[in-house]
Curated annotation (Swiss-Prot):
Function as written in the Swiss-Prot or TrEMBL entry: Probably interacts with GlcNAc residues. May promote attachment to both epithelial cell surfaces and chitin. This function enhances bacterial colonization in the gastrointestinal tract and may also be important in the environment by augment colonization of chitinous structures, leading to improved survival. Promotes bacterial attachment to, and colonization of, zooplankton in the aquatic ecosystem.
SUPFAM superfamilies: E set domains
Protein name, UniProt field: GlcNAc-binding protein A
Keywords annotated in UniProt: Chitin-binding, Secreted, Signal
GO MF term list: chitin binding
Subcellular location: Secreted
Segments forming domain Chitin-binding type-4: 24-201
Lineage: Bacteria, Pseudomonadati, Pseudomonadota, Gammaproteobacteria, Vibrionales
């Protein structure tokens, strides 16, 4: 039986209210970017090759959250913690060896770097640094490894950028494997976002015109004795079983993910003339105990390679439904309490933690749950200050392995006096065609919103009952049109 992907999910039910994201972003290559960041490749496959970073820990679910103290290089994350920005969530990113991370091709000269924001803080600037020519890729990243004069600085002018921005930079001359550090200095907090980008400069490594990247062996999970892992090779007509390579897991050693990845890559190189697997070393393909790219011979007629599994038993399914969290909680004389209901699928350990925006834990709960169990819990916050807060839910199996993680955002707000008619011009959407820059409306959430200045003011009139993305307070893109008063 072919191995099905492990089914993991955390369903977040918020009385019909979707989650919010606050001031987070990552280096991407969706439209114009030359290379994705290290953390980006923990969640998303590389553009063009499908490569991914593995064993990234919890940050693979939150690539937009590599946030730490600003002021680099004078202050900021300490040496050895630059890639993670000192965030415990991203600690795995601080591992540093020559073969630990997927490397994206790059050339010196004009290049485009791209950021994707899940929410867009006003911005002071973006800075880009690169490692020195003689840096040691097998030591933790430190200030000594980098040229501390940024090769590119883009001013943010203390305004909100769009949800995706591109920066044109001149990349210095380098050879081989280098690391670029991209720093987004937000303007309304004492924090910055740090993304390292693993790159390999073209023209300095082996030139292999006869081989094309076509897939990769990702050691994503351990297997069991009796399982089989195999390649699925495709040509123009679909899968061609004649080019399949199978590896039977017949020893305890081979059950480990890095071991079977190495063994499968080695077997491909030994048995297939049109395929090669491993990291490039000179003009050789060398299997490694980690992710092994797969290449196909030019002119072979083969197009791509995927990995399949045959297993003795299906993987367990895990899910956790969390309901009852409100979008906002008003601060009062009594401690804030979150009344939640949990429903488990599968035997698991469920963990919930509440953090404020500065990552300070305010409440936590953990307990083993059985399949189908329904449980009501109350989390009481240790302090209540107005602003952004997060409820982080984690699922672990009975062996303590993390199966999934999700973050849900909510706000604590100060008590407010209900607005009077004199405080606003219209009750939204009344008078829609009269909305101009500065127009104030009373929205469905009871708050007042003011139409942004030009060139954003035109969005204020873009609303129908079937197109609500700019509806103040509740639309998916309301912040592009309105300021909350």
């Amino acid at each position: 039986m072919k191995k099905q992907p492990k089914m993991t999910a955390i369903a977040l039910i918020l009385s019909g209210i979707s989650g919010l994201a606050y001031g987070h972003g990552y280096v991407s290559a969706v439209e114009n970017g030359v290379a994705e960041g290290r953390v980006t490749l923990c969640k998303f496959a590389a553009n063009g090759t499908g490569e991914k970073n593995t064993h990234c820990g919890a940050i693979q679910y939150e690539p937009q959250s590599v946030e730490g103290p600003d002021g680099f290089p004078v202050t900021g994350p300490r040496d050895g913690k630059i890639a993670s920005a000192e965030s415990a969530l991203a600690a795995a990113l601080d591992e540093q060896t020559a073969d630990r991370w997927v490397k994206r091709p790059i050339q010196a000269g004009p290049q485009t770097f791209e950021w994707t924001f899940t929410a867009n803080h006003v911005t002071k600037d973006w800075k880009y640094y690169i490692t020195k020519p003689n840096w040691n890729p097998n030591q933790p990243l430190s200030r000594d490894a980098f040229d501390l004069n940024p090769f590119c600085v883009v001013e943010g002018n203390m305004v909100q950028p769009p949800k995706r921005v591109s920066h044109e930079c001149i990349v210095p001359e380098r050879e081989g494997y280098q690391v670029i550090l991209a720093v987004w200095d937000v303007g309304d907090t004492a924090a910055s976002f740090y993304n390292v980008i693993d790159v390999k400069f073209d023209g300095n490594g082996p030139v292999l015109p006869d081989w094309n990247p076509a897939g990769q062996i990702i050691p994503s999970m351990d297997l069991s004795i009796g399982d089989t892992v195999y390649t699925r090779v495709f040509d123009n007509d679909g899968e061609n079983p004649a080019y399949r390579t199978e590896l039977k897991i017949d020893s305890e050693t081979l059950t480990k993910a890095n071991q079977w990845s190495y063994a499968l890559a080695t077997k491909i190189n030994q048995t297939q003339k049109q395929q090669r697997a491993g990291q490039l070393n000179g003009d050789q393909f060398v299997p490694v105990y980690g992710t092994n790219p797969i290449y196909l011979k030019e002119g072979s007629g083969l197009k791509s390679v995927e990995i399949g599994y045959q297993i003795e038993a299906p993987q367990p399914e895990y899910s956790l439904t969390v309901s009852g969290l409100a979008k906002e909680y008003e601060i009062g004389e009594q401690p804030i309490q979150l009344d939640l209901t949990l429903e488990a699928q599968g035997e698991m350990s469920a963990e919930l933690t509440v953090y404020n925006h500065h990552q300070k834990p305010l409440a936590s709960w953990s307990q083993a749950m059985t399949d189908g169990e329904l449980k009501s819990i109350t989390l009481e916050l240790s302090e209540a200050k107005a602003g952004h807060h997060m409820l982080v839910s984690r699922i672990k199996d009975r062996d303590g392995n993390l199966q999934d993680q999700q973050t849900l955002d909510f706000m604590l707000v100060e008590p407010q006096t209900p607005p009077t008619p004199g405080d606003y011009d219209f009750v939204f959407p009344n008078g829609l065609k009269e909305y101009v820059a500065g127009t104030k409306v009373l929205a469905s959430d009871g708050a007042i919103y003011q139409c942004k200045p030009w060139p954003y003011s035109g969005y204020c009139q873009q609303w129908t009952s079937n197109a609500t993305q700019y509806q103040p307070g509740t639309g998916s893109h309301w912040e592009m049109a309105w300021d909350k008063r």
